[in-house]
């Protein structure tokens, strides 16, 4: 999931935002993760925009994808080169309208963008955790987010919205905390990682661990495994695009030359140069150990096993919310059949579900790109949710 896709800003930005931090678990009252380990303190980095209304019923939790962060919209400083990773969707007058909704986005635990992860200091040693950091799950991420949401004064979310791994978190929220979620918008996602998705992640992890600078995860005082992480990212980028996208964007065009170089170390083709650029850019902002932990959390994700004893129908029997599910025609990482399967399980439980497969040539990353149809659907879906919430609140008076 290439969270920082270039796009032309449209509409009005939320303007300047501030990254904040909240301790969701202390050292003396740790968070026990699903692997059985106790973790504390646990800090989440988060950002908000918009205002929580008096009824506290307009909060939308936006959930980031694999290597994203809390910076979903706006700018830290007026001169920043680019806004948050979903600025095209979040802001005044945009589908997730910050004039109407209170938007929350946090960096997941295990991350490296301000939340507690393997690069954080272990209070027991004063050194970075490295591989002593406990293995985490999507469920652990959501449990930490729940504490943040409650801290912010929200007892019931208007919606949980996310694509890719963010969609996994949205699904987890909907069945783990059904009384806290009015609606959910899982985009380009799945109820369980397929063998194909696991395979790509494993190859990426092996690339990192094969880098001699990885040093068993203990590289924080030395040279990081930049080459291995870059190769891992290159593998990921292949899965985020599609055959059609690659043909249109690159085809077999050469990079800065008119004929083959006949030098193995040189990137002859534009697609080679693109992948190398994306890999090198990634190592400047992401921690290799976090990549290992978060990809493993995605691989472990299996909503059917964790909440339904192997049955998607049984898992969604716990849910109470309305869903808007969207897949993309060229997404071969989480293809449409996986979304159709989850929608069928939802409907077998009598849940209110809207589903659309959107025609898009750009592959898995299409959920991050401008799409008028998707934008309109999300805007209308949230509008209805807010109206329904107001009616429900009025009946409760």
From Swiss-Prot:
<dbReference type="InterPro" id="IPR008220">
    <property type="entry name" value="HAT_MetX-like"/>
</dbReference>
<feature type="active site">
    <location>
        <position position="364"/>
    </location>
</feature>
<comment type="function">
    <text>Transfers an acetyl group from acetyl-CoA to L-homoserine, forming acetyl-L-homoserine.</text>
</comment>
<keyword id="KW-0808">Transferase</keyword>
<feature type="active site" description="Nucleophile">
    <location>
        <position position="164"/>
    </location>
</feature>
<comment type="pathway">
    <text>Amino-acid biosynthesis; L-methionine biosynthesis via de novo pathway; O-acetyl-L-homoserine from L-homoserine: step 1/1.</text>
</comment>
<feature type="binding site">
    <location>
        <position position="365"/>
    </location>
    <ligand>
        <name>substrate</name>
    </ligand>
</feature>
<keyword id="KW-0012">Acyltransferase</keyword>
<feature type="domain" description="AB hydrolase-1">
    <location>
        <begin position="58"/>
        <end position="368"/>
    </location>
</feature>
<comment type="similarity">
    <text>Belongs to the AB hydrolase superfamily. MetX family.</text>
</comment>
<dbReference type="GO" id="GO:0009086">
    <property type="term" value="P:methionine biosynthetic process"/>
</dbReference>
<feature type="active site">
    <location>
        <position position="331"/>
    </location>
</feature>
<protein>
    <recommendedName>
        <fullName>Homoserine O-acetyltransferase</fullName>
        <ecNumber>2.3.1.31</ecNumber>
    </recommendedName>
</protein>
<comment type="subunit">
    <text>Homodimer.</text>
</comment>
<keyword id="KW-0486">Methionine biosynthesis</keyword>
<dbReference type="InterPro" id="IPR029058">
    <property type="entry name" value="AB_hydrolase_fold"/>
</dbReference>
<dbReference type="GO" id="GO:0009092">
    <property type="term" value="P:homoserine metabolic process"/>
</dbReference>
<keyword id="KW-0963">Cytoplasm</keyword>
<feature type="binding site">
    <location>
        <position position="233"/>
    </location>
    <ligand>
        <name>substrate</name>
    </ligand>
</feature>
<dbReference type="GO" id="GO:0004414">
    <property type="term" value="F:homoserine O-acetyltransferase activity"/>
</dbReference>
<dbReference type="GO" id="GO:0005737">
    <property type="term" value="C:cytoplasm"/>
</dbReference>
<keyword id="KW-0028">Amino-acid biosynthesis</keyword>
<dbReference type="InterPro" id="IPR000073">
    <property type="entry name" value="AB_hydrolase_1"/>
</dbReference>
<dbReference type="Pfam" id="PF00561">
    <property type="entry name" value="Abhydrolase_1"/>
</dbReference>
